[in-house]
Structures are given as structure tokens and as C-alpha cells.
Amino acid sequence: MRYPISWLLILCWICAASAQADFSEAFEEVWAVPEIQAKIDAGIEAHRKGDAVISVVDKDGVPLSEVTITAVQQTHNFLFGANLFVLGQLATPELNQRYENAFTDIFNFASLPFYWADLEPVRGQLRFEKEAPFIWRRPPPDVLLAWCKVHNITPKGHPLLWHSINPDWIPTEAEALRSAYTKRFEEIAQRYGQDILIWDVVNESLVCSKKYALYSEALDYVPWAFEKTRPLFPKSTLLMINEVTQVSHKPVAENQYLKQVETLLAAGTPIEGIGFQFHFFSRDNFHKYFPHDPTFQPDNLMTVYERFSQLELPLYITEITIPGSGDNGFTDQAQAVKQLYRLWFSIKRMAGITWWNLADKTAYGNEGQALGGLTDENLTPKPVWHALDQLINQDWTTQCTGKTDEKGRFSFRGFAGTYQINVVLNNERKQSFHISLPEATKALITCTID
């Protein structure tokens, strides 16, 4: 039987709509399980908050009751970020300003590009400075660092050593390449060591190409890189290892990344942070794993992160792409991201979460097909941006008001970060000051009113 083309189109549309609805419902069935949500909520409450007690006394030390205290959170200790790869590189000043606004409105953390191929495309000609020749997605680090300082953004360098995106001129013999890397490490540490205190030292070693000059079955270039870089950077610098999505999230019993990191730490390798990528560069790839693949079920994700947490090092989700392409893609993207961020935020040792490309059409190569930005290409926020804004600036930001008790104390529990405290007595502001509230501790502050 032949069907008119119009009926075939309608049928295709119905099937596509059904598939989208099925994904949304299936995702919720997996992630909205009450026991899982309760565990996530408990983790956030236990690991992301602290307690503060404000004690108000007069000049003689006598406690003052009925004093109004307002606590307003100003910053987060937890690092929420994205890469900063196209800062100032968009088509118009308006788009560049919208990019900055979309970034600073929700983020306090930025990944800066140190890919060797673009930092030193010609041997000896380093692209550190503002005047360096333009390369798309590779603004000079000096420019990015200056912007981070102005906007109180914590910078992170990525990466120092990777088997990919290297200049054509690098040596093909192992010892000569090690010497070239040593020089690279020294130059970067000398210029940025005091200002950039988090670095991905080794990237994606477990998928290293066998054609890479430093490759060996033992991957001994990994401890070598950490041992070379550790003396070059201040002790306060966090030196990280970073690994790809499907490798780093395997169940514990078969997780080669866990085995690698444990072995390196046991041998004394100075790894100080552990990074997990979370890239899905197409809708088909995302649907291959979500919501039913066991590796990316919420219970396995929590088990993997909790097992890595036993190593007592900070954990970071370092690179995230969740696609927004396809019918209903923007809604599905926001739905998935809300659940994933909540899970990540609940893990005790988790210290930061980095989205990858802030805007659509700014990704590397064909990775842009995923439409994995938080905004569209015109920098208009997508539902996923609003979902993160709600989490970071509303759900996970504390503001409270109350009065001191008969002992002159006002207590509150809030998300870790800095707070502005306003003290009002008899409708007159007496003091305003800032406090720092750490995670899982109690801050005791005494305020004296004349």
C-alpha cells in the first residue's frame, strides 16, 4: 500500500515526538527515584554547608538580645565554571559582552587553554601576550588571566601534557621530547605559577596513542610529568590528572582509572586532584548511555565518586558536554543537567564542576553538532543556563534574617562561602562585615556594639 507523502511526514513526526517523550519519561524514572534523591539531598546538606553563630555584645561584653542579623551569601567556596576559550573572540562587541555576562552571572571558575599546538605554533614563539596573533578558541593566557582577576574568577590551566593537539615541530624521539616538555613546563610555571593555582598536568593518558613518542605500556610519562612539574610550581598549586568520560566512570571493579591513580599515589607520584570528563558530543551518543546504561546510572556514578573520594583528594568534573540538539533537545538538556549537577554537588570530595563550551557554535571541530552550550550562538540563555542559575544562585545560595536570643546569639546554617553580615539595633544599622563559612564546620563570630 502506498501512503501520501504528507501522511509519512506526519507519521515520522509522531514517532519522533514519541521518542522524545519516551526519553524524558525514562530519564525521570531512573533519576527521580525517592531513595536516590534523598541520598543526594543528604549529601548536599552534609558536605556543602556549614554552621555560623553570630554573638552580639555591648562594649562591656554583655549579650544583646533582639538584635536583627541578616546574612547574605556573596561567594561560593565550591567552584562552578566553564572554559573561557572564546573570550573577546566573537563577531561583535555586543556578543562579547553577552558572553561575559552569561559567564559571570553564574560562574566563579574558568579553564584557560594551554594547548601546546596553539601556545607555541612556531618553536620559541610563545603566544602568552595580548599582542599574539589571533587563533580561534585560543586567546592569549595573559588576556584571560587579567579578565579573571577583574571578575574574581579562579583560573585553571589546561593541559600541560597531552598526547594530542601538539605542534608539528615537536621531537619524535622520546628523550628530546622530554627535554622540550621540561622547557615548556618551566616557561609556563615561571610566568603563571603564582597566579594559576590549579593545573591539569596530564590529560587522557589511558587513551594515549601508541604513536605518541612518550607512549609505553606502563605509561611512565605520567609520573614523570608530575615529578617534573611539582618543584616548578608553588606548594599551594593543585596538580591534577584528567581522564575521558567512558574510562573514568566505569564501575569500580573494572575502573582502570581508579587502578592507575591508586598505583601512582602508592608510588609517591604527587597527584593532588582527580579530574573526570563528562562529554557526549552528539544526541545519539548521549542516548546510547542515558538513561539506561549501567555505567551512567546514578547509583553507579555515586559509587564511583565515593570510591575515588577514599583517596582523600579533591575531585573535579572537568569538562561537560550534554547535547541540546534534536527535537525537545533544549528541554532534555536542562532536565539532565539539573539532575547531574545535584548529584555531583552532593559528593563529599567534589570541589568543582566545569561546563565545557558556554555558547553553541563555539566548540572544537564537529563537537559543535551537539549544541552543547548553555546559551545559543547569539548568547541567549537556553533552559539549561536557567537551570544552573536556579541551582547556583537560588537553591544553593543562602540568605537569612533573624534576631539574637537571650544570650545574644543568632545561628544559621548555610552554603559554604563568604557572607555579608548586617547588624541592626533599634532600626539602625550598627555594623556590616564579612565572614567566611567553611564546609562542615562551625564559625563563631563575636560582634561588639558600642
Model-derived features with residue positions:
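Substrate-binding cleft and catalytic face of glycoside hydrolase catalytic domains
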Residues: 109-125, 138-246
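Acidic-and-aromatic substrate-binding clefts and catalytic sites of carbohydrate-active enzymes
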Residues: 86-95, 117-122, 127-128, 132-139, ...
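Beta-strand-rich domain onsets/edges
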Residues: 20-65, 70-88, 121-125, 156, ...
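Short Pro-Gly-centered beta-turn/loop motif in secreted/extracellular proteins
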Residues: 92-105, 411-418
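Aromatic- and acid-rich polysaccharide-binding/catalytic face
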Residues: 105-117, 185, 192-207, 237-245, ...
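Aromatic-rich peripheral "rim/lid" segments of glycoside hydrolase catalytic domains that contact
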Residues: 29-30, 191, 200-218, 225-228, ...
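Alpha-helical scaffolding within the catalytic cores
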Residues: 90-101, 139-143, 183-188, 216-229, ...
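Bacterial N-terminal signal peptides
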Residues: 6-16
